[in-house]
Amino acid sequence: SILFSDSSFCAQQGYDTATIACLFVPNTYEVYWNISIENLMKRMKKENENFWNAQRTIKADALGLSKEEVCTIASIIDEETANNAEKPMIAGMYINRLNAGMPLQADPTIKFALKDFALKRIYHNMLQFDSPYNTYKNTGLPPGPIKIASVAGIYAVLNRTAHDYLYMCAKE
């Protein structure tokens, strides 16, 4: 993880320290224990290129989003819900907020900014925390994903439910 904080290492991979998590596509990979970091990164780049096929890239472009932006939204959605059936609806809401120029107001980004994913509830005083990941204080997307986005999360963004919703209410 020290390498992922190294801006020159991340730049060699085509990312920065905020977006390096976008390189990784969750899957099961077979690699040998003695693989070099260089060869592992080459493998991850190849897997990433295979994942981001023409169809997925066209869908991202149609939304006006880069691959990194898709992964960033997906990472937030993944932290909002574990229910894959809900993810396209939530994706639609966040994309509506972005298109309206509204702050995302995504609680998972506050958890990330505070470095405490165990938080069950976000309180008003937490919303004042100064961070580029605070989507209550800042409009637009945070600098990068808050975790490695799941394939289901990415799929939800690329196939978001089209609706006019700007808000949601969690049951728990």
Task: Give the location of each predicted region.
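Bacterial extracytoplasmic/cell-wall-associated proteins, especially those involved in peptidoglycan
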Residues: 3-172
